[in-house]
C-alpha cells in the first residue's frame, strides 16, 4: 500500500487535542501506510504523545501554531484574519501537495470559505457541496447533499451535486450504478419549484447517471436510492432533524429497557443485538462530511465528536484519498457533459 499523508487540524472541535490526538493514534495503528501532519499548539499536543512507541511517532509530524478559528467566527473574518490558524495551515498542506487530504472538526463556514479559496473548485463545478451518509433500512448508507454549504441553488448546481454524489458513492461504496434522486415535496413530475424541476430535466438527459426521479422526505431512509440531492437549506434541516430523532429513539429505547425486572433481564440476554441496533442509529457512527467539488480532499468532523466518531471521519478521508476522489469527479463530469452536448 502506498503511503498516504493526512493533514489534521488538531485544534478544531469542542475538545481539540484531547479527542483529535488519541483518535489519530488509533488511526495510525489501524492504517500502517498512514502518515499524519498535526497542525496546532505544540504545548497541548506533545504531552499526549510522550509515551508513544517510536514506530508510530516516526509517522507523525507537528506544525506549530497557537491560532485557532473560533466556532463563532464568521467565514469572511476567518478567511481574512486567521492566516496562521490550524485550520488554514492544514488546508494549505493539501494545496501544496504535502498531504492528500485534510480533516477538521472546526467552524464549518470557515472551512468551506478557506477551502474554496485555497483549493479552488474542479473544472465544471460552480460550488463545492457538503455531503454525508445516513443509515437506511437495508443497512447500506444513503448519501445526502448539500448539507448547508449552499442554502440556495440553481438547477445547474443541483445537477452538479448529483454528479458529485454519484461519483462519491461509486468511490466509497464501490457501487457501480448508484440511484440518484432529487428531494422534493412529491414524486410527481409536476411537483416542486422551478430549480428542482429543471434539475430533474437535466438529469433525465444524462444517460451515465442512474436517475430515479423525485423522492419525498418519508422515503429518505428506505434504501430505495443511494444519493439524494437538495439545496443546503433543506439538507441541513433534514440532517439535523434526523440526528435529533435518532438520539431521541436511542434515549427512549435505553430508558424503556431499564423499567421492570423482566425487561432488564431480557435486555441483558439480547444485549449484543440491542447494541448493534443502537450503533446503527447513533449519528456518531456516520461522522464525517465531505466537502466535495474541490481540487483537494477536505473532510469535516462533528465538533462534538468523541474518539470513535473522529476515527470514523479519519477513515473517510483515507478512503477518499485512496480512491483519488477529486480526479474521479472531474473525469466523470467531463464525460457526462460531453454526452449531453453531443
From Swiss-Prot:
Gene3D superfamilies: Isopropylmalate Dehydrogenase. GO terms for molecular function: phosphate:acyl-[acyl carrier protein] acyltransferase activity. It comes from Shewanella loihica (strain ATCC BAA-1088 / PV-4). Belongs to the PlsX family. GO terms for cellular component: cytoplasm. Its EC number is 2.3.1.274. The keyword Transport does not apply. The gene is plsX. GO terms for biological process: fatty acid biosynthetic process; phospholipid biosynthetic process. It holds the Pfam family FA_synthesis. Keywords: Cytoplasm, Lipid biosynthesis, Lipid metabolism, Phospholipid biosynthesis, Phospholipid metabolism, Transferase. Homodimer. Probably interacts with PlsY. It catalyses: a fatty acyl-[ACP] + phosphate = an acyl phosphate + holo-[ACP]. HAMAP family: PlsX (MF_00019). Catalyzes the reversible formation of acyl-phosphate (acyl-PO(4)) from acyl-[acyl-carrier-protein] (acyl-ACP). This enzyme utilizes acyl-ACP as fatty acyl donor, but not acyl-CoA. It is found in: Cytoplasm. Pathway: Lipid metabolism; phospholipid metabolism. This is Phosphate acyltransferase.
Amino acid at each position: 500500500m502506498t503511503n498516504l499523508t493526512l493533514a489534521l487540524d488538531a485544534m478544531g472541535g469542542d475538545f481539540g487535542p484531547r479527542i483529535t490526538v488519541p483518535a489519530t493514534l488509533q488511526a495510525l495503528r489501524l492504517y500502517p501506510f498512514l502518515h499524519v501532519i498535526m497542525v496546532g499548539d505544540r504545548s497541548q499536543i506533545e504531552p499526549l504523545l510522550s509515551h508513544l512507541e517510536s514506530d508510530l511517532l516516526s509517522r507523525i509530524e507537528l506544525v506549530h501554531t497557537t491560532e485557532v478559528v473560533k466556532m463563532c467566527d464568521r467565514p469572511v473574518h476567518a478567511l481574512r484574519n486567521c492566516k496562521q490558524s490550524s485550520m488554514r495551515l492544514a488546508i494549505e498542506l493539501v494545496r501544496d501537495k504535502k498531504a492528500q487530504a485534510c480533516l477538521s472538526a472546526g467552524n464549518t463556514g470557515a472551512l468551506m470559505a478557506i477551502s474554496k479559496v485555497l483549493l479552488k473548485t474542479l473544472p465544471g463545478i460552480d460550488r463545492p457541496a457538503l455531503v454525508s451518509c445516513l443509515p437506511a433500512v437495508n443497512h447500506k448508507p444513503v448519501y445526502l447533499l448539500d448539507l448547508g454549504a449552499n442554502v440556495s441553488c440553481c438547477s445547474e448546481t443541483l445537477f452538479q451535486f448529483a454528479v458529485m454524489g454519484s461519483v462519491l458513492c461509486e468511490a466509497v461504496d464501490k457501487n457501480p450504478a448508484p440511484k440518484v434522486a432529487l428531494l422534493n415535496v412529491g414524486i410527481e413530475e409536476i411537483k416542486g419549484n422551478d430549480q428542482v424541476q429543471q434539475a430533474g430535466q437535466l438529469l433525465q438527459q444524462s444517460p451515465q447517471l442512474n436517475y430515479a426521479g423525485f423522492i419525498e422526505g418519508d422515503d429518505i431512509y428506505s434504501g430505495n436510492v443511494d444519493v439524494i440531492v437538495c439545496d443546503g437549506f433543506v439538507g441541513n434541516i433534514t440532517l439535523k432533524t434526523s440526528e435529533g430523532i435518532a438520539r431521541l429513539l436511542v434515549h427512549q429505547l435505553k430508558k424503556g429497557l431499564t423499567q421492570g425486572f423482566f425487561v432488564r433481564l431480557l435486555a441483558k440476554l439480547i444485549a449484543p443485538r440491542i447494541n448493534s441496533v443502537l450503533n446503527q442509529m447513533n449519528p456518531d457512527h456516520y461522522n464525517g462530511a465531505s466537502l466535495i467539488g474541490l481540487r483537494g480532499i477536505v473532510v469535516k468532523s462533528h465538533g462534538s465528536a468523541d474518539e470513535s466518531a473522529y476515527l470514523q471521519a479519519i477513515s473517510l478521508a483515507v478512503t477518499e484519498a485512496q480512491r483519488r476522489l477529486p480526479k474521479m469527479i472531474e473525469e466523470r463530469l467531463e464525460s457526462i457533459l460531453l454526452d449531453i452536448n453531443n
